Swiss-Prot record:
UniProt keywords, alphabetically: Acetylation, Heme, Iron, Metal-binding, Oxygen transport, Transport
PROSITE patterns for the chain: GLOBIN
Protein name: Hemoglobin subunit alpha-2
Sites where the protein binds heme b: H89
Amino acid sequence: MSLSAKDKATVKLFWGKMSGKSELIGADALSRMLAVYPQTKIYFSHWKSCSPGSPEVKKHGKTIMMGIGEAVTKMDDLERGLLTLSELHAFKLRVDPTNFKLLSLNILVVMAIMFPLDFTPMAHLAVDKFLCALALALSEKYR
């Protein structure tokens, strides 16, 4: 699924509106993923706590959203732009790529909750397409 010029512009516009709350979005989305899909906790067994609001969840939520923010700037070539992150997740962290989609779903939920007026159906569509493209780019090294 490719991103049109309109999709890219919509993602950039929405990211600009929500980026000030990206840490909160990341922490909430990660907390939701860990609660709704408890099997994902296996990747974080070294943490003291996977509970919502724990320092580890907040920190990793911030890291995730910083990575997504970087991806927003590399939308024209996500595969090449995220090569290092793809290699990290495939070879070192060994994250099942299915989890990228699970996290994306939770990010969409949190964005809709936090930005009900800005997260229009068109914004939802564009951000969803972007997160799908991002997940695909991160999965590239698994092939």
